[in-house]
Amino acid sequence: MIPLGEFLVEDEVTFNESRRKVLRLAQALGFDEIGATRLAMAYSELCRLGVDRPGGVRTHLGLEEQPGGLALGVDFAFSANTGAPLVADAFFRSFTAIPGAAWSYRGLLPLPDHCFRLDEELLESLRSRLAHPSRE
């Protein structure tokens, strides 16, 4: 996976900040308003499972080469057993446990533009957006 950024979601502030950034990332990757909002909603629902627990939930975002083009990958590493997140199967094309990582899952969602090309300038721009605080 080509890493884009990561978040430790452990309270309301980090939850809201990371959700906004995921929404903007989805828009930058070519998802329409509905697709971007659905991704942010699924991300929110999954983060809610771990946000109030000690250690929160760590998320990693990246792009992964898949047959037919790139996919957005979102890893969720929970600090405790949350059970299998049911909402994920309804949204991600693939949602599986990460081998060897307790309570960790990877969701994959193909980018809407199968011809999407990632260059170094765009990659650095996406990483910068995720790394710096939102202005809201």
Residue ranges and their predicted role:
Residues 2-31:
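Helix-loop-beta hinge of the Bergerat
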Residues 15-18, 32, 36, 40, ...:
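Generic alpha-helical secondary structure
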Residues 1-4, 49-136:
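Conserved beta-strand-loop-beta-strand hairpin that lines the nucleotide-binding pocket
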Residues 26, 33-40, 96-100:
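GHKL (Bergerat-fold) ATPase N-terminal catalytic module, capturing the glycine-rich phosphate-binding loop
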Residues 31-58:
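Conserved ATP-binding N-box helix of the HATPase_c
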